[in-house]
């Protein structure tokens, strides 16, 4: 069985014709001819529709009828259903009739098509009687939207003075309606503000309508654009604002802010320094300000220049040469200001040039003296003293015309040869030698002085170059050292050497040297070549080498100067043994002159000085050793005078209270060695010995007291010996001590009854005293 497709729409009559044609084309009730289809073949069922249409935004009551779906199945058994995202929400179908309804107003601008699936099922079993079929519901557009601009505010710019019709900006408004349906999406633009200077084309392009838009008068404009839909039902429209900024062009000339500029400047202003500025007004933006300043008719363009400051567009006046108050005190000239980069198309009635008068007053400054020349060059003949070599002259450029005093700066030793007078005359004190210094460069100083002769502090310097002129004061000599050799069997006429000459003086091109021998009795002769050279040749031939191995040949050399000078140079010719080919085999050259350089002399002197110092140190050391032996002390004994501070005792003073030699002799059981005969002075040291060991129970403290008393009397009555007092300092001493004072300063011979055994009870600090003054019978050591 074959299905019938039907497309229905309320109010759409033309769809009926389409449905009728479709039904006629596939009508299942048409007769079957014998050759068309087999009688036993079953016809396939199929949908007779696939598309429906409905207008958007319908104002009639809901639901809105869309169309009908129909199947050739027995309608008593069929039930129609819809499947899809919008089924049951936006659309529903009458399950009995197949009518499709819209449940809400549709908006094409939101959804223009809906895709659904139609089902035909059995009413009882709910099983599909036909295969599901998809169809589309298209929403027809109505003109229900007005244009909306892409931006609410637009910004644009255009050069000022632009011609009529110059494009400014393209604005766009969008209509959400279907552009394929009639004129639903067509937009019409118009200006509601700013139409006196601008216009808008149908495409939304804004153009200029005034060619005299001047940025300096008004630089910004506001234009309001309206976009509307002529076919719209509600007559709504959209608006946007356009802000148009005029771009600057160079259409204005600079104008001086003053007609006259006056400046005062000191005459000593440095060349190239700014002395004043010229200001102009140019309403154009900075990038279009290109003012050029120039002198009118070339006035003082050789004295001043005017540079343009690129940041401020001002003219800066600078001197290009020194100013002189005494010569010109005021400068007056005219300056012109113009802009060479201006666009003449925009030039109106404004004058392209603007002029101003400039007056520069030069003020006087106390200036230093000025020499008449930048430098001086004098010539002086060597070997002469001249009272006046040349004069320098400096003047005070100021009106005061102060006096000038001259002096030579002693920057080198060369200046000591010259002097200068108060008037600037230069003279030489000593004769000069051109061969030592051909040039002398002096620095002459000129100072201003007041009426009292006191310098004012203003001074100038100038360089003076003195050239020493040459005179013929040096005799000719050999051009280089010669070491000629000759074979002892040299034949007559054999060339020995060719010599040439030189002169320390300036030798002109026409100088001529004459050569000759001072003696003619030798075996050599000289031939002058008349080209400032000479040949020495063998005169007779053959030499006796055993008789003379070296021949000294004086050569006279004369020049043609005025006066002519003659010098003698000695040529040392060595006689050598030669083989048969004339080759030298044995030569003994002349002994070279022995000389010692200054460096060698200094080295020899330093060596001698070093040797002398070492010798003196050795002698001094030996003398000190002899003095030590004279005092009866050996070197080890002297070293024993060093104090060890970790031992208890009286400190550094103990070193003078005993004789080390005595203690050493006592330690070894011997007596003190005798004094040398040369030591005639009395001993200042006490020969301290511990009393001999006594029998048990015996006490002999009086012997120690007697010894101390004897020594004290000797010291008190010795008139030839110097005073030798010793102060002993102990850690525990005085009235608070058990032993009271132990100092020997207040004791005499009356202490013989003192018992020193109590020192043994005082501990290790007084062990030494206890051993010295105690009478321990068990002690074997003797100090």
From Swiss-Prot:
Which stretches are Extracellular in the membrane topology? 46-599
List localization entries.
Answer: Cell junction, Adherens junction; Cell membrane; Cytoplasm
The UniProt entry lists the main location of this chain as other
What residue intervals traverse the membrane? 600-620
Q: Which biological process terms from the Gene Ontology are attached to this UniProt entry?
A: adherens junction organization; calcium-dependent cell-cell adhesion via plasma membrane cell adhesion molecules; cell migration; cell morphogenesis; cell-cell adhesion mediated by cadherin; cell-cell junction assembly; endothelial cell morphogenesis; homophilic cell adhesion via plasma membrane adhesion molecules
Which residues form the pro-region? 26-45
Segment Required for interaction with PALS1: which positions? 621-660
Which amino acid positions bind Ca(2+) 3, per UniProt? 143, 145, 175, 177, 184, 229
* Sequence positions that bind Ca(2+) 1: 56-57, 107, 109, 144
InterPro entries this protein is in? Cadherin (IPR039808), Cadherin-like_dom (IPR002126), Cadherin-like_sf (IPR015919), Cadherin_CS (IPR020894), Cadherin_Y-type_LIR (IPR000233), Catenin-bd_sf (IPR027397)
Topology in the lipid bilayer? Single-pass type I membrane protein
Can you list the disulfide-bonded cysteine pairs? none
Q: Which residues are glycosylated?
A: 59, 155, 361, 441, 523
- Post-translational modification summary for this protein: Phosphorylated on tyrosine residues by KDR/VEGFR-2. Dephosphorylated by PTPRB. O-glycosylated.
Q: Which residues bind Ca(2+) 2?
A: 56, 109, 141-142, 144, 177
PANTHER family for the chain: CADHERIN-23, CADHERIN-5
User: What job does the chain carry out?
Assistant: Cadherins are calcium-dependent cell adhesion proteins. They preferentially interact with themselves in a homophilic manner in connecting cells; cadherins may thus contribute to the sorting of heterogeneous cell types. This cadherin may play a important role in endothelial cell biology through control of the cohesion and organization of the intercellular junctions. It associates with alpha-catenin forming a link to the cytoskeleton. Plays a role in coupling actin fibers to cell junctions in endothelial cells, via acting as a cell junctional complex anchor for AMOTL2 and MAGI1.
What protein does this entry describe?
Answer: Cadherin-5
């Amino acid at each position: 069985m074959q299905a019938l497709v039907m497309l229905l729409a309320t109010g759409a009559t033309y769809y009926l014709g389409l449905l009728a044609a479709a039904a006629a084309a596939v009508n299942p009730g048409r007769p079957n001819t014998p050759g068309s289809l087999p009688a036993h073949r079953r016809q396939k069922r199929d949908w007779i529709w696939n598309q429906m249409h409905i207008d958007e935004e319908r104002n009639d009551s809901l639901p809105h009828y869309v169309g009908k779906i129909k199947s050739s199945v027995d309608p008593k058994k069929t039930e129609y259903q819809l499947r899809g995202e919008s089924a049951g929400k936006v659309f529903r179908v009458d399950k009995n009739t197949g009518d499709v309804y819209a449940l809400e107003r549709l908006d094409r601008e939101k959804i223009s098509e809906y895709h659904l699936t139609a089902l035909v099922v059995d009413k009882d079993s709910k099983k599909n009687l036909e295969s599901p079929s998809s169809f589309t519901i298209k929403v027809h557009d109505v003109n229900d939207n007005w244009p909306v601009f892409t931006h609410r505010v637009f910004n644009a710019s255009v050069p000022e003075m632009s011609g009529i019709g110059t494009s400014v900006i393209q604005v766009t408004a969008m209509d959400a309606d279907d552009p394929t349906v009639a004129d639903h999406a067509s937009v019409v633009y118009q200006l509601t503000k700013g139409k006196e200077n601008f216009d808008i084309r149908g495409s939304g392009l804004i153009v200029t309508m005034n060619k005299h838009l001047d940025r300096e008068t008004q630089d910004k404009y506001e234009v309001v654009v309206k976009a509307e839909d002529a076919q719209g039902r509600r007559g709504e429209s959209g608006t946007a604002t356009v802000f148009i900024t005029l771009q600057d062009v160079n259409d204005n000339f600079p104008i001086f802010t003053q007609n006259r500029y006056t400046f005062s400047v000191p005459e000593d202003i440095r060349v190239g320094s700014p002395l004043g500025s010229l200001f102009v007004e140019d309403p154009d933006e900075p990038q279009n300000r290109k003012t050029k300043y120039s002198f009118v008719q070339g006035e003082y363009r050789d004295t001043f220049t005017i540079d343009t400051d690129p940041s401020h567009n001002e003219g800066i006046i600078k001197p290009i040469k020194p100013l002189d108050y005494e010569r010109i005190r005021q400068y007056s000239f005219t300056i012109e200001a113009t802009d060479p980069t201006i666009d003449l198309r925009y030039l109106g009635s404004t004058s392209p040039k603007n002029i101003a008068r400039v007056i520069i007053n030069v003020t006087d400054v106390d200036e230093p003296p000025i020499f008449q020349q930048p430098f001086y060059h004098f010539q002086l003949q060597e070997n002469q003293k001249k009272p006046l070599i040349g004069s320098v002259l400096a003047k005070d450029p100021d009106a005061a015309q102060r006096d000038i005093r001259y002096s030579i700066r002693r920057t080198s030793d060369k200046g000591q040869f010259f002097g200068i007078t108060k008037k600037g005359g230069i003279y030489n004190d000593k004769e000069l030698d051109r061969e030592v210094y051909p040039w002398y460069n002096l620095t002459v100083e000129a100072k201003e002085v007041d009426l009292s002769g006191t310098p004012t502090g203003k001074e100038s310097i100038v360089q003076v170059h003195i050239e020493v002129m040459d005179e013929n004061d040096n005799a000719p000599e050999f051009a280089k050292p010669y070491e000629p050799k000759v074979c002892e069997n040299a034949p007559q006429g054999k060339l020995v050497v060719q010599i040439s000459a030189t002169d320390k003086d300036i030798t002109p091109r026409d100088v001529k040297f004459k050569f000759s021998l001072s003696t003619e009795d030798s075996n050599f002769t000289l031939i002058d070549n008349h080209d400032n050279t000479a040949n020495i040749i063998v005169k007779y031939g053959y030499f006796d080498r055993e008789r003379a191995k070296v021949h000294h040949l004086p050569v006279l050399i004369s020049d043609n100067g005025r006066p002519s000078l003659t010098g003698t140079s000695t040529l040392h010719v060595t006689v050598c043994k030669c083989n048969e080919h004339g080759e030298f085999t044995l030569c003994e050259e002349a002994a070279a002159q022995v000389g010692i350089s200054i460096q060698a002399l200094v080295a020899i002197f330093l060596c001698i000085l070093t040797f002398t110092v070492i010798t003196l140190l050795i002698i001094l050391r030996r003398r000190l050793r002899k003095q030590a032996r004279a005092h009866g002390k050996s070197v080890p004994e002297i070293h024993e005078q060093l104090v060890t501070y970790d031992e208890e005792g009286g400190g550094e003073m103990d070193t003078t209270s005993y004789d080390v030699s005595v203690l050493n002799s006592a330690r070894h059981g011997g007596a003190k060695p005798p004094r040398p005969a040369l030591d005639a002075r009395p001993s200042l040291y006490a020969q301290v010995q511990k009393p001999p060991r006594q029998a048990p129970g015996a006490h002999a403290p009086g012997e120690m007291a007697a010894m101390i008393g004897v020594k004290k009397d000797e010291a008190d009555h010795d008139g030839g010996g110097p005073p030798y007092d010793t102060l002993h300092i102990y850690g525990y001493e005085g009235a608070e001590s058990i032993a009271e004072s132990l100092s020997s300063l207040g004791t005499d011979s009356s202490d013989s009854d003192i018992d020193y055994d109590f020192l043994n009870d005082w501990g290790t600090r007084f062990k030494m005293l206890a051993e010295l003054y105690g009478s321990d019978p068990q002690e074997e050591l003797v100090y």
